[in-house]
Amino acid sequence: MIKRNLLFVILASLSSLSLRAQTPTPADAMALEQQGSLAEAERTWRLITQNTPDDAAAFASLGLVLSKETKYEEAITAYKKALALNPKLPGIQLNWGIAEFKQGRFHEAITPLAGALAADPDSAQARTLLGLSCYGAKQFAEASKYLAVVVKTQPSNTELRKVLAQSCLLAKNYSCAESEFRQIVQQNPDSASAHVLMGEALDGMSRTPEAIVEFQAAAKVAPREPDVNFGLGYLQWKSHHYDDAKVSFQNELAIDPNHAQALAYLGDIAMKENNFGQALAYLEKAVQQRTDLRVAYLDLGVVLMEQKHYPEAMAALQTAIKLDPTRPDAHFRLGRLYQALGNAPEAEREFAKVRELHEKEDDVASKMGKPPE
């Protein structure tokens, strides 16, 4: 009997030792991470969280390993569990935000990154990622607010300054955009993109002559860069410098013979010069390349009407209206076409629409001109 009891004691002791040997510890998991055995480290952290389900740090560590394995969805679940257990655990919101950001989920990244920045206002990483997430989420005013602070501490970071400048431009904060683009041009005088962005900012401020100078500089630096010559031509067209614009558009076509916008605006210039045959050739080719160019369909309608191809003209004008029903010019042209066809009721309907749209434009303009109440 004594021997039997002794055997039971020894067996119980061995079982206890075996269980202790099989119970993983955080040190085991961290050692596996350092060895690069991420799959084993993940399994170990999962066992630890099962054994100690109230251990926030264990869930946080599991999230880090999962992120290293690019298992971002699972990592986010682990981070959220860690935060639920201990909302004050440092670094978790930042890691959660990074996992969202790396998936391109910019809207979802904003909340945890804002939390990370609130917890550590001196974190350049949290502020930078928050600014970039706002930019990715098209919250441009917010993006510029965060990125402006970061750029001040990293003045030589041209790529980050470009994002800041574009954020300012898209938020219609043109003075900020101009200031940042000037810095970029000074740092990179041979950068075509810097001159283009500066030109866009100046044009946004209705300083088109200065914008043209910037686009000319871009075209000089990179004469075969796609869209640079078109951008220059568009500004020249906008300024009614049609001869210069034609040269720029032709330069774009030398790079891309099917550049739909260059074709459309060359067609517009030919139409304005009453060269309807050439205009028709350009415009028809433009709409073959792209079906969303309102100016091409509007001009096609005008040219076809001049040539008395009324059914085709009507189809083109109706397409222009469908692309943007708020613009009065296509309605006016369609009204004139109905007049030519002797359809007075339809003509009057289109002219009424023209008056309505002009009244809306006048109303908006008058409201914009009023001082704030």
Stretches with model-predicted labels:
Residues Q22, A56-A57, P90-G91, A124-Q125, ...:
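Helix-start (N-cap) detector for alpha-helical repeat units in TPR-like alpha-solenoids
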Residues Q34-R43, L47, K68-K81, K102-G115, ...:
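Structural signature of tandem alpha-helical TPR/SEL1-like repeats
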Residues N51, L85, A119, K152-T153, ...:
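Structural marker of alpha-solenoid helical repeat scaffolds
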Residues Y234, Q261-A264, D268-K308:
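Alpha-helical adaptor scaffolds
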Residues T23-T52, S61-K68, K102, Q166, ...:
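Alpha-helical segment of the N-proximal tetratricopeptide repeat
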Residues T23, F332-E373:
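Terminal, low-structured helical/coil segments at or just beyond the last alpha-helical repeat
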